[in-house]
């Protein structure tokens, strides 16, 4: 059985590299491991690539894994005067691919990252992507933005007046309390929540929470484009879904199954928002078994 390293060990075995995003150079953390078919794993909000720590040992035997931290998250740079956007995060993924020499890859996208993957899919459809996406696995995210149900803390952060004030005073206790309802009842989330907080608060990252939360507005602005990207693509898609998720759970699953009835869909009935943390064995099995 592979041992799962803690956050410091995770960072120690990755690297922080300078990538050009727009007109500026930004430091981005990436972790690569394994050998074989390329698989790019993209994390959610408000966490980091460490979300994949329980899966990586199971996947790396037959896959070359690439796991970046998005700008503003984890061990990546966290500029305080910045307009964060999902489009820029898609640029970041492209830059990570270019640096690693990736020509084709499968994508695994959770939460926040489902929109990044949808944008990359749209770019591929337009002939504007240099990397071939061979398949995408989506996990618990706002694929259909109008069905996304933000948690109270997220809504408060999105408010122009409250958001900066909350970012200025948020602490580990408030943060982990906000995460609590997103885990399944009975799941002991203490360790995972603590690690997510440590990744978030690195370099004072909690202070930009109100800037990162703008992804919700990005989804509203780009929703038509991103929905078309998944509903019109020939790229194999599959879904691994925690049905107890209060944010994007059973209600989102219903729409996905209605609009994409032929896509493989694994419903995890006892899992909430964090399939990779709550049910890593089942998620790994699905990723290794499905065609996407």
Regions of interest found by a model, annotated:
Residues 31-75:
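Conserved HGGG/HGGXW glycine-rich cap/lid loop of the alpha/beta-hydrolase fold
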Residues 268-284:
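Catalytic histidine-centered segment of alpha/beta-hydrolase-like enzymes
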Residues 173-188, 195-201, 212-218:
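Helix-loop "lid/cap" segments that line or gate small-molecule binding pockets
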Residues 15, 21-23, 31-33, 66-110, ...:
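Active-site loop/oxyanion-hole signature of alpha/beta-hydrolase fold enzymes
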């Amino acid at each position: 059985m592979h041992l799962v390293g803690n956050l410091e060990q995770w960072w120690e075995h990755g690297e922080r590299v300078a990538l050009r995003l727009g007109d500026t150079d930004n430091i981005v953390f990436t972790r690569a491991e394994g050998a074989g078919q390329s698989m790019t794993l993209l994390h959610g909000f408000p966490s980091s690539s460490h979300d994949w720590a329980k899966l990586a040992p199971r996947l790396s035997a037959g896959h070359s894994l690439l796991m970046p931290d998005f700008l503003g998250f984890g061990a990546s740079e966290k500029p305080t005067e910045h307009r964060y956007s999902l489009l820029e995060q898609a640029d970041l993924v492209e830059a990570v691919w270019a640096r690693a020499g990736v020509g084709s890859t499968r994508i695994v996208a959770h939460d926040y990252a489902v929109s990044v993957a949808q944008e990359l899919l749209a770019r591929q459809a337009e002939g504007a992507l240099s990397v071939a996406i061979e398949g995408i696995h989506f996990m618990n995210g706002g694929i259909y933005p109008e069905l996304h149900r933000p948690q109270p803390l997220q809504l408060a952060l999105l408010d122009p007046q409250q958001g900066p004030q909350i970012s200025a005073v948020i602490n580990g206790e408030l943060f982990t309390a906000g995460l609590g309802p997103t885990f399944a009842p009975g799941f002991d989330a203490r360790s995972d929540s603590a690690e997510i907080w440590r990744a978030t608060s690195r370099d004072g990252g909690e202070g930009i929470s109100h800037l990162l939360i703008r992804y919700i507005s990005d989804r509203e602005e780009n929703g038509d484009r991103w929905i078309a990207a998944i509903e019109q693509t020939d790229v194999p898609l599959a879904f691994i879904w925690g049905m107890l998720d209060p944010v994007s759970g059973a209600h989102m699953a219903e729409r996905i199954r209605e609009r994409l009835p032929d896509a493989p869909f694994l419903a995890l009935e006892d899992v909430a928002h964090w399939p990779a943390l709550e049910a890593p064995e089942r998620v790994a099995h699905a990723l290794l078994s499905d065609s996407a």
